[in-house]
Amino acid sequence: MEYGSIVTSVADIWKEASTESERYSQIIYGESVKILGKEGNFIHVESKDGVKGYVKKRLIGDYSEKRYKIIRRFKAKNLILPFGSYVNDEDISDMKIPEVYIKNINEKYDPVILAKKFIGVPYLWGGTSDFGFDCSGLTQRMIRFGMNYEIPRNSGQQRDASIEVKDLEHAKRGDLIFFEGHVGFYLGNNEMLHANGSFSRITINNLKDNSEYSNMLLSIMQKIGRYKY
C-alpha cells in the first residue's frame, strides 16, 4: 500500500475531485495518508481517521516515519506550520525550526488547556487546524495532540465510540457533550468550550444560564461521553 505525507500547512479533503465539492475534512503538515488512486490533479486518499476523499496532488509528498509535533504555529519565510503539525529530523534541519516550537511525539498535554488557547479562532466547516475548526475537528485535534489518542472524525462517530456519562452532575472536566450534529468539551461548572457555528468562532458557553442559546442546546443534547486516554 502506498502512503504519502502532507507538504503544505493545511490540505482540504474534498468529497469529489473538485474544489467545488464539499469539504469533508482537513489534514495538516506532516500527517500521513493512504493513497487509494489518482484522478486528474487530485489524489484519492484515506486519512488515518478513516476519512476518504480527494486532495490536490501537489500537496502530497513522500512519507517519513520519524516525526515530532509542532506545539505552536511556526511562521517560516514561505510556510506557516499549524499547531499539531508533524515534522521529522530533515524538516527541522531544512526549516531551521527553533526547538521551543517542537516536542517529542509521545509527550502529553491536557486537551482542555490546549483547546482554551484557541478561543476566538474562526469556525470552519471541515476545519481541523488553528486556521479554523469545526466542532468535531477541534475535539479530535486536541485529544490527538494532547493525549496521542485517536477518536473518530465526526461528532456522531465520536458520540457512538464514547463511554456514556449519566448526566451533567456526573460529568468531569474534559468529557465531551454531544448534541444533534455537534460536540464540545465540558469544562465543569456547566460550561462548555466548542467550535460554535452560531457564533462563527470557538467560544465558552454556560449550559444553564437560562439564555435562549443555552436552552436550545440543552433541548438537543444527546449524550455526555468519556474517553479513557
PLM features: residue spans?
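Structural motif
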Residues: 31, 85, 174-175
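Active-site nucleophilic cysteine motif
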Residues: 115, 129-146
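Second-shell loop/turn segments in exported
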Residues: 122-130
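...with weaker cross-activation on analogous glycine-rich loops/strands in unrelated enzymes
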Residues: 149-210
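Low-complexity, Gly/Ser/Thr/Pro-rich intrinsically disordered linker/tail segments
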Residues: 215-229
